[in-house]
Amino acid sequence: MKTKFIAISLGVALLLVRNVSSVADASWLSKAMDRLETSNAKLSPTWPKAEQYRHYRPGQAIGAPLPDEDMRIAGVSLGTSFDAVKASLGQPTSEKRDELTYGGIKFGHSLMQDSRPIVWYMTVSNRDAVTARGIAVGDSLKKVMDIYGRPDFIDFNNRWFYGYLRYNSDNIVGIFFEHNGSKVTKIIISDN
């Protein structure tokens, strides 16, 4: 009886170990393929580089306004009052005078605007939300480019921007994708 129990226990343990390693192998392979795909894309002459975006005159218009649905996160649009955000999403995990936080999503307000706080910018720092076109933190830059096309601008912090801006000014309306060189690390939707 004791031998049978030991044999069954060893069999179960071997199955568990075997399944864990195959999951790790699949994850490793997926990550390696993603790195290879991004590396190949970066070698392409069509891959955007920051220096390609430095020839503009101050005040020059760049890009075009994005559709309204692109300027929304978790059903909230720029210009929405903080009260309407709370009515839609419930009680925030953190609330400050100029910011509402729901996990990895922040809705911000400029204190220089009127006294009734409205959403002026939104940031996503984890996979709690996606853009209207389905991009989330952790997605590859290749996926961003496949869905949004070439960036309208790459700023001095190497963030990819899609939307409308006036070069060297605060007139910026669109989406920034912060990244680590291959993956999106933060999404910012802004109306400065």
Language model: regions and residue ranges:
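Sec-dependent N-terminal signal peptides of Gram-positive bacterial secreted proteins and lipoproteins
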Residues: 1-26
